[in-house]
Amino acid sequence: METPLREQENSLESSNERSSYISEAAAAIPESANLGEEILSQLYRPLEACYNTCYCKKCCYHCQFCFLKKGLGISYEKSHRRRRTPKKAKANTSSASNEPIPNRIRLCQPKKAKKETVEAAVATAPGLGR
């Protein structure tokens, strides 16, 4: 029979062995966590400039920068505003667009008036009585 102190020491040794196994398993987890952190740091790292001008499939997908710029067409560069065309260039358009709008409306209105007069004449004309 062992003394109670030795039993406690043996139980402590066995618990230390278990904790060593746990620490080894826990040691494997941080490596994968480190890998995950490394991947995340790569995602949030500013993209490096790539000066490849080819738009083939291989070149569009070879890095994240090229994928965004060439594959998706996203560019964060300052875009230049387009200049307005001069007023003189606008005056050279077709003659129909130069005609004012009210004149066009007047051309259409007499046709409607003729229809109304025909309808009024039919309404006032005496019919064949009953």
Curated annotation (Swiss-Prot):
Family annotation (Gene3D superfamilies): Tat domain
One annotated Gene Ontology cellular component of this protein: host cell nucleolus
Complex and partners: Interacts with host CCNT1. Associates with the P-TEFb complex composed at least of Tat, P-TEFb (CDK9 and CCNT1), TAR RNA, RNA Pol II. Interacts with CCNT2; the resulting complex is unable to bind to TAR RNA.
Coiled coil: none
Positions of region (Cysteine-rich): 50-66
Sequence segments annotated as region (Disordered): 78-102
Sequence ranges of Polar residues compositional bias: 91-100
Subcellular location, record wording: Host nucleus, Host nucleolus
Region feature (Core): 67-77
Key word Transmembrane present: no
Organism from which the protein derives: Simian immunodeficiency virus (isolate Mm142-83) (SIV-mac)
Motif Nuclear localization signal, and RNA-binding (TAR) in this chain: 78-84
GO biological process: positive regulation of viral transcription
GO MF terms, alphabetically ordered: RNA binding; RNA-binding transcription regulator activity
Pfam families linked to this entry: Tat
Compositionally biased region (Basic residues): 79-90
Family matches, as InterPro entries: IV_Tat, Tat_dom_sf
Keywords: Activator, Host nucleus, Host-virus interaction, RNA-binding, Transcription, Transcription regulation
The keyword Transcription regulation is assigned to this record: yes
Functional summary from the UniProt entry: Transcriptional activator that increases RNA Pol II processivity, thereby increasing the level of full-length viral transcripts. Recognizes a hairpin structure at the 5'-LTR of the nascent viral mRNAs referred to as the transactivation responsive RNA element (TAR) and recruits the cyclin T1-CDK9 complex (P-TEFb complex) that will in turn hyperphosphorylate the RNA polymerase II to allow efficient elongation. The CDK9 component of P-TEFb and other Tat-activated kinases hyperphosphorylate the C-terminus of RNA Pol II that becomes stabilized and much more processive. Extracellular circulating Tat can be endocytosed by surrounding uninfected cells via the binding to several surface receptors. Endosomal low pH allows Tat to cross the endosome membrane to enter the cytosol and eventually further translocate into the nucleus, thereby inducing severe cell dysfunctions ranging from cell activation to cell death. Through.
Protein known as: Protein Tat
Family note: Belongs to the lentiviruses Tat family.
